[in-house]
From Swiss-Prot:
Its EC number is 2.1.1.173, 2.1.1.264. This is Ribosomal RNA large subunit methyltransferase K/L. Residues 45-142 form the THUMP domain. The keyword Transferase applies. It is found in: Cytoplasm. It holds the Pfam family RlmL_1st. It catalyses: guanosine(2445) in 23S rRNA + S-adenosyl-L-methionine = N(2)-methylguanosine(2445) in 23S rRNA + S-adenosyl-L-homocysteine + H(+); guanosine(2069) in 23S rRNA + S-adenosyl-L-methionine = N(2)-methylguanosine(2069) in 23S rRNA + S-adenosyl-L-homocysteine + H(+). It comes from Hahella chejuensis (strain KCTC 2396). Keywords: Cytoplasm, Methyltransferase, RNA-binding, rRNA processing, S-adenosyl-L-methionine, Transferase. It is an enzyme of class 2 (transferase). The lineage of its organism: Bacteria, Pseudomonadati, Pseudomonadota, Gammaproteobacteria, Oceanospirillales. Specifically methylates the guanine in position 2445 (m2G2445) and the guanine in position 2069 (m7G2069) of 23S rRNA. One of its GO terms (molecular function) is rRNA (guanine-N7-)-methyltransferase activity.
Length: 717
C-alpha cells in the first residue's frame, strides 16, 4: 500500500513531543497544531504508531478535507472518498461527529450528510449498503467540523491512553499518555538508558511507575491491549501487522532482560498501593517495580548501583482556597525532603498551583505547560544538586507550623502578635470577649480579624483592580495560615467572610449549612454569635460603645430598637433597667435570635419582639418611647418590603417618624454605616442634633474611623 496521511491527536501542550515521537516510529511529520500532529506514513508506520505511541490519543487515517462549510460542500467532499476501500458491503460502521462549522451547526446533521454520501457510493456500484450501528460498528468514521472539515478512519477504535492495565484508579487519576509525556519532559528516556533510578513518592494507583517501567524496558504500550479496528479494514495486511507486532515483542523481551536500573513507588494510602500492585501485575511489571506503603517524607529508596536518579510526582493540587491552604505545609515538607534526601537527583513536580510550587523552595530549571484534561498545569523540573540551600543561621521559630513562610508573611505574623498582646490586655479590662485584633494594619494584608472567645472571623476587603489577583490570593492564604498559629487556635475555628457584590439579596444571606455557635461577653451581657452560617456574626462589634451608653442611660426608660437585628442593644437596655423594650425587625430568624439572647441573660418582663416592615410599623405605631435606637441598613430590597430602602434618600422621613414617637426629653440614636452618608440639613434645623461619631467608635476600631456615623437627636427646647 502506498503512503497516506494520518492525524494523531494528543492532550494540549504535547504536540511537539508527539511529533518527535512519531518521527522515531517512522513517520514523516507534515504539520502540528494544538490538537495533534499530521504525518505521512506507510502501512507499517501506521501499525507501529498504534502499537507504540505513548503520547497519542486517537489515530486517524485522513480521507478528505474541505473548507466549504455547507451541506453540499460536505457531501461533495465525502463523495470523493473511495468508501468501498475502507468499508465492506453490508458491514456495520459508525460516524463519530464533533463540532460545528458554517451552515452545519449540529454534528448529527453533518453525520447524516456523510452517511448519505457513503450510501450513494455503494448504491452507485450496486453494492449492499453498509449499516449504521454504534454498538457493533466494525469501523468508525470520524467527522471533525471546524474551520477545516476533515474526514478520517479511526485506526485504533479507542484512545491510545487506554493501555489496559488500569481498570481502577485512585483519586484524581493521571491519564497514561500524560504520565508518559511528563516522563519524556523530565528526561527519563535518557536517564533510564544509563540504568538510572526512578521514584514516585506519591504514586497513587501507580500510573507514573508503570509508564516509567515501560519506557525503561522499551515495551510498546499497545502490547498490553493489542486489538485495533484496522485489523478489520479491507486494506489490512496481516503479514505486515505480524511483522510489526513481533518486532515490538522482541524489543520488550530484550528490554526486560537488559534493564539494570530501579523503579520505586510509595504512597501513604494502603488502598492506593494495593491498586498500584494490581495495575503492575496486569502490565506484567510487578517483578521490576518496588512498591511500599509509606510517607513521601520518610521513604528512602535503595539506589545503590544506579546511574542518574529521577524523582517525579503529582502531588494534590488543591483547587479550592481551603485545600490549597492545607497543602502548603505538604509542599514545603516535600521541598525539605528533596534537599535532605535527594541531594544529587533530578526532580519533576507536576501541579496546577503556582503558589504551591513556590512553597517547594527550589528554583526550577525548566517549566513545561501542560493540561490535565481541561486543567492548566505545569511540570517544574529541578536539579536538586544545584539547588542545595545556603547554610542558615540557627533561629527559633515562633511556631513550628509556620516554618518556611515568606518574609512578608513573617512581617504580618509579627504585627498580629503585637496586636494580640495589646488588644487582649485591653479587652480583659473592658470585660470583653469579642473584639477586633487586626484591621488592615499592613496595607498588603487588607483584612479585618475579629476574635470571638476562641473563634476567629477573617473579613477580606476587596482589593483594588490594580492589585494582581494571584498576589491577593497568595496574601489571603498567608493570613489564613498565620492567624490560627499566632492566636493559638485550631484552623477549624477560623471563618473567612468575603463580601461580594450580590444581586437581589441582602448581604446577610446564609453562607454555610453548619452551625458554629458560641457565646461572648460584653460589659456584663452575653450574646449568642454564629461564626459560620452568615456573613455577619450576630453582633456588630463597632456598635459596642453605643450599646454600653444605652445600658447606662436606660433605667426606667421605654426603649425602642428599630432594625433590631439580633437584639443586642435591647439586651443592654433591659440589663440597664429599661421599663420596657420593643424590638422590631422583618426577619423572624433574627427576632428568634434576639429572644434567645434575652433568655441567655435571664431577662424577663415587658419585652416585645415585633416582626414587621419598620417603615410601615413606624407609621402605624402610637406609643411613646424615651430612648430609640435606629440603625438601618444602607440598602434593602427584601421581598417582604413593597419599597426599596435607600438610607441616603429615605433617612429624613425615617427620623421624622421616629421623632413623632419620641417622648419629650427622650433621645433618638441614629447610626449609619454608609461611608458617603450626608445628614439632611432639614433634620438639623428642626431638631437638636449632636454628632456622637467619635465617642461611638470603640478603641479597637479607631483604625477605621469611617466605619459608621452616629448622632443623638432630641426635640428642640
Amino acid at each position: 500500500m502506498n503512503e497516506f496521511s494520518l492525524f494523531a491527536s494528543c492532550p494540549k501542550g504535547l504536540e511537539y513531543v508527539l511529533a518527535d515521537e512519531l518521527k522515531t516510529l517512522g513517520a514523516e511529520v507534515l504539520r502540528t497544531n494544538p490538537a495533534g500532529v499530521e504525518a505521512k506514513v506507510d502501512l507499517a508506520g501506521a501499525y507501529r504508531i498504534c502499537l507504540g505511541s505513548r503520547l497519542a490519543n486517537r489515530v486517524l487515517r485522513l480521507l478528505q478535507s474541505t473548507r466549504t462549510a455547507t451541506r453540499d460542500g460536505l457531501y461533495q467532499a465525502a463523495s470523493e472518498v473511495n468508501w468501498s476501500e475502507h468499508l465492506r458491503p453490508g458491514e456495520s460502521y459508525w460516524i463519530a461527529a464533533f463540532g460545528s462549522s458554517g451552515d452545519i451547526r449540529h454534528s448529527r446533521f453533518g453525520a447524516q450528510v456523510v452517511k448519505d454520501a457513503i450510501n450513494d457510493h455503494f448504491r452507485d456500484r450496486d453494492l449492499e449498503l453498509p449499516v449504521i450501528d454504534k454498538r457493533s460498528g466494525v469501523q468508525t468514521v470520524q467527522l471533525n467540523l471546524a474551520k477545516t472539515i476533515t474526514l478520517g478512519l479511526d485506526l485504533a477504535g479507542r484512545s491510545l491512553h487506554q493501555r489496559g492495565y488500569r481498570q481502577e484508579g485512585a483519586a484524581a487519576p493521571l491519564k497514561e499518555n500524560l504520565a508518559a509525556a511528563i516522563l519524556y519532559r523530565a528526561g527519563w528516556p535518557e536517564i533510564c538508558g544509563e540504568d538510572g533510578c526512578f521514584v514516585d513518592p506519591m504514586c497513587g494507583s501507580g500510573t507514573l511507575v508503570v509508564e516509567a517501567a515501560m519506557i525503561a524496558m522499551n515495551i510498546a504500550p499497545g502490547l498490553l491491549n493489542p486489538h485495533f479496528l484496522f485489523e478489520k479494514a479491507p486494506w489490512h495486511d496481516p503479514e505486515v501487522w505480524r511483522g510489526v507486532y513481533e518486532e515490538a515483542m522482541e524489543k520488550a523481551v530484550l528490554g526486560k532482560r537488559r534493564w539494570r536500573g530501579a523503579i520505586f513507588g510509595c504512597d501513604l494510602n494502603p488502598a492506593a498501593i494495593r491498586t498500584a500492585k494490581r495495575n503492575l501485575s496486569r502490565a506484567g511489571l510487578d517483578r521490576w517495580v518496588k512498591l511500599e506503603t509509606a510517607s513521601a517524607m520518610d521513604f528512602t529508596p535503595d539506589t545503590e548501583g544506579c546511574g542518574q536518579r529521577l524523582l517525579v510526582c503529582n502531588p494534590p493540587y488543591g483547587e479550592r482556597l481551603g485545600q490549597e491552604l492545607e497543602l502548603r505545609s505538604l509542599y514545603r515538607a516535600l521541598g525539605r525532603r528533596l534537599k535532605t534526601a535527594y541531594g544529587e537527583w533530578k526532580a519533576g513536580i507536576f501541579t496546577s498551583s503556582v503558589n504551591l510550587a513556590k512553597e517547594i523552595g527550589l528554583r526550577a530549571d525548566k517549566q513545561y505547560h501542560l493540561y490535565n484534561g481541561p486543567l492548566a498545569t505545569t511540570l517544574y523540573l529541578f536539579d536538586v544538586y544545584g539547588n542545595r540551600p545556603e547554610a542558615e543561621t540557627p533561629r527559633k521559630p515562633q511556631n513550628a507550623s509556620l516554618e518556611g513562610i515568606s518574609e512578608q508573611a513573617q512581617m504580618f505574623r509579627n504585627r498580629l502578635s503585637k496586636n494580640l498582646a495589646k488588644w487582649s490586655k485591653w479587652a480583659k479590662k473592658q470585660q470583653l470577649s469579642a473584639y477586633r485584633i487586626y484591621d488592615a494594619d499592613m496595607p498588603e494584608y487588607a483584612v479585618a480579624i475579629d476574635w470571638y472567645d476562641g473563634g476567629i472571623i477573617v473579613q477580606e476587603y476587596a482589593p483594588p483592580k490594580s492589585v494582581d489577583e494571584e498576589k491577593a490570593r497568595q496574601r489571603l492564604l498567608d493570613v489564613l495560615e498565620v492567624t490560627p498559629a499566632v492566636l493559638g487556635i485550631d484552623g477549624g475555628q477560623l471563618f473567612l467572610k468575603q463580601r461580594k457584590k450580590q444581586k437581589g439579596m441582602l448581604q446577610y444571606e446564609k453562607t454555610d449549612s453548619s452551625r458554629k455557635e458560641r457565646t461572648v461577653e460584653e460589659h456584663g451581657c452575653r450574646f449568642w454569635v454564629n461564626l459560620s452560617d452568615y456573613l455577619d456574626s450576630g453582633l456588630f462589634l463597632d456598635h459596642r460603645p453605643t450599646r454600653y451608653w444605652i445600658q447606662k442611660h436606660s433605667s426606667g426608660k421605654r426603649f425602642l430598637n428599630l432594625f433590631c437585628y439580633t437584639g443586642a442593644a435591647s439586651v443592654h437596655a433591659a440589663a440597664g433597667g429599661a421599663a420596657t423594650t420593643t424590638s422590631v425587625d422583618m426577619s423572624q430568624t433574627y427576632l428568634s435570635w434576639a429572644e434567645r439572647n434575652f433568655h441567655l441573660n435571664k431577662l424577663s418582663g415587658p419585652h416585645r419582639f415585633v416582626r414587621a416592615n419598620v417603615l410601615d410599623w413606624l407609621k402605624a405605631e402610637h406609643n411613646s418611647y424615651d430612648l430609640i435606637f435606629l440603625d438601618p441598613p444602607t440598602f434593602s430590597n427584601s421581598k417582604k418590603m413593597e419599597d426599596v430602602l435607600d438610607i441616603q434618600r429615605d433617612h429624613a422621613g425615617l427620623i421624622e417618624d421616629c421623632m413623632r414617637l419620641l417622648a419629650p426629653g427622650g433621645v433618638l440614636i441614629f447610626s449609619c454605616n454608609y461611608r458617603r452618608f450626608k445628614l439632611d440639613s432639614g433634620i438639623e434645623q428642626r431638631f437638636a442634633v449632636e454628632n456622637h461619631t467619635a465617642a461611638s467608635i470603640p478603641e479597637d476600631f479607631k483604625r477605621n474611623e469611617r466605619i459608621h456615623q452616629c448622632w443623638h437627636i432630641r426635640h428642640s427646647a
